[in-house]
Amino acid sequence: MKEVRVVICGDQGVGKSSLISALIQEDNVTSIPKVFPIISIPSNPDSNDDVSLVLVDTQSDSNEREYLAAEIKKANVICLVYSDNYSYERVSIFWLPYFRSLGVNVPIVLCENKSEDLDNYQGLHTIEHEMIPLINEFKEIEACILCSALEKINVNELFYMCRACVIYPITPLWDAKERTMRKATIHALSRIFFLIDKNNDDLLSVDELNSLSEKCFSKNLSIEDASEILSKVKEICPEGVYEGQLTLPGFLAYNRVQVENGKQESTWGILRAFHYTDSLSLDDSYLSPKFEVAPGQIVELSPKGYRFLVDLFYQFDRDNDGALNNEELSALFRHTPGLPEIWVSSQFPNSTVLNEHGYVTYNGWLAQWSMITLFDYKTTLAYLAYLGFDTDGRGHNTDALKVMRKRVSQNRKVSKYDRNVFLCFVVGSKSCGKTALLSSFINNNTNRLTPNTVVNSVEFQSTQRYLVLSEIGETDLDILAEPKSLEACDILCLLYDSSNPNSFSFIANLLNLYPDLQKIPCVFAATKADLDRQQQRYPVQPDEFTKQLGLPSPTHISTAAIWNTSKEFFIQLAESAQYPASSIIRIPEEDSNKTNYQLVAALTAFGALLLSVGGSLTWKIIKHQYYSKK
C-alpha cells in the first residue's frame, strides 16, 4: 500500500475542514475554505512503512451526494465527525446506515469535534455514554476520539488513528464488544513466544526479549527498557513475571494493553516480523516460497536445514534421553497444524528409528525429515516456516534445502552421485523376507507394525547418508511400469529366499516383464542365510545369472541369526546408489541373443501370472504426493 485515503464525512458545520486546516497549518487561521481540495501528506521520514496520507474533504449537501458516494467507495478509512447533539443523533440515524447502503467495508474513526470546553470527567462521560454504545452497535467503528480543531487538541492523534486503522487495523486483533483480544491474536502471539523461547523454559529472558526487539523493530533493548516492560507487566498481570523473566500470560497481557490503548502498532510490528497477514494467517509466500526444481533434480535438506532440526530436537528433548517421547513431540508441533499429513500417512513414528520405549531417536528424527523432504519438499518448507527456521537470522526458509541431481538412467559414465538421501525399491516373492529386512533396517525388534516405507541413516566412508527402503509387494508391481516411479528409484534391491527353491524365479521373471528395470542399479540378495540353502528351480542358478548380467553375486543375509549381516548389506545398498556404475546391468552386445537371461520369458510363462495390479497405502502416498509433482 502506497497511501491511506481518508474521507472526512459529517454534517455541515461540524468542523471537517477546520480539522484539516489544524493539521496542515501551524498557525490558527480565520479564513478556511468551505471544502479543501484533496491533500496528500508524505510519510514521516522516521516511519518504517513509507505510506502517505491522502485527505479527502467532503460536503453533506444533497447536490454533492454523488461525489460523496464516489469518494466514500474509494476510501481506505472514513473519519466521521460530529460536534453537537443533533449531529451526534445523525451519526446513527443517517451516516452509518448510509455507509452500509453503499456497501463499503472500511474502518470508521468516530470523532467529536469542538470538545475544547470538556473537562476530563465530561470527556469520559462522552466516551462512555455517546461513543461506546455506537461502537457496540456498529462494528465498523474501530476507534473514537475527542478533538478540538480550534485548540488543536488531539488533531494529530485523530489522523494518526485514521492511518493506523488501515496500516495497523485493530479489528483483527481486538473484539470491541467483549473488550478482549481475539483467539487468533492469542494463538499468533503464543506461537511467537514459543519461537523466541529458545531454551524452552516457558520464559522470555532479557536476552530473548532483546532478540525479539532486534527482529521486529531493528533496535536493541536496553536493560532499562526491559526492566520498564517487566515492571509494567507486573502491574497489570502479577503472574506475568517470574524470576525477572516474562511468562506467556505476561507477554499476552502486555500486548493486550497496547492494543486496548490504541498502540496496536507495536503488536503489528511483532506479528508482521513473523509473517502474519492482516487476517492473522501466515503469509502464503512464506509457507510456500518460490523454489525452482528443474527436471532431473531432487531436493534434500541443506546443512543449515539439518542444523535447525538438530537444534529443534535438543530444544524439546527435555529429559535428555536422546529421544522425543509423545509429550515432547506434541509440544514441538503444538503451534503448527499438527503432524504433516504425509507423516501420518507414512505411519510415523513407526517409519523411522525408535528406542526401546517407542520414542523417536535423534537419528530417527533426522531420517524422517530426510525422507519427507525427498518425497514432498513443499511440506518440509511449510513446516520449517511453522517451526520458525528463519527466527534466528538463518536466512530464508529455502536456505534449509538444496537441489541435487537425480540418477541418470543407465548412465555408466556417472561414477558418483554427491547426494545424502537415496530411495531403494525392495522387490521379491511373497515371504522372502522383505518386511523382515525393513524391520531390521529400523531396528524394530518389537511387535510394532513396520510400514512399507522406512528410513534410517547409513554411515560409510566416515559420512552419514540416509537410505529409504520401500517394499513393493506382489500387488504393487504396477509401479515398476511407471517411468516416473522408476526415475525416482536410485537402487533396486532384488531379494529371494535361499531356502525356498521357487523364490529366485520370481525376480528373474520380473526383469523380463519389466525391461526398464535394467536401467536401474541392482543389488541381488539371498535372504534367510541361516537356513539350509536350496537349489533354485530355474535354468540358471543365481550366481551364474548375476554374472551374465555383469553384476556381483547375490549377497547372503539373515535378519534372524545372531550373526545378522544386514547392517553391512544396507551399507552395500547405499554405496551402490552413490556409486552406481558397478551395479548397472551389462550384457555384452554379441551375447545378447544367446544369454539365458533373454530366454527366461519363454521358459517361465507362469511368472506373468504372479504379477497382479494394485497399490498399497504407502505407495499411494509416494505416487500421489511425490511422483505427481515431478
Curated annotation (Swiss-Prot):
This enzyme's EC code(s): 3.6.5.-
Class in the EC hierarchy, top level: hydrolase
Gene Ontology MF, one: GTP binding
Keyword Membrane among UniProt keywords: yes
Residue sites binding Ca(2+) 1 per the record: D197, N199, D201, E208
InterPro entries: EF-hand-dom_pair (IPR011992), EF_Hand_1_Ca_BS (IPR018247), EF_hand_assoc_1 (IPR013566), EF_hand_assoc_2 (IPR013567), EF_hand_dom (IPR002048), Miro (IPR021181), MIRO_dom (IPR020860), P-loop_NTPase (IPR027417)
Organism listed in the record: Schizosaccharomyces pombe (strain 972 / ATCC 24843) (Fission yeast)
Principal subcellular localization: mitochondrion
Name listed for the protein in its UniProt record: Mitochondrial Rho GTPase 1
Binding site for GTP 2: 428-435, 459-463, 527-530
Bilayer disposition of the protein: Single-pass type IV membrane protein
GO biological process assignments: mitochondrion organization; mitochondrion-endoplasmic reticulum membrane tethering; small GTPase-mediated signal transduction
Cytoplasmic side: 1-598
Binding site for Ca(2+) 2: D317, D319, D321, E328
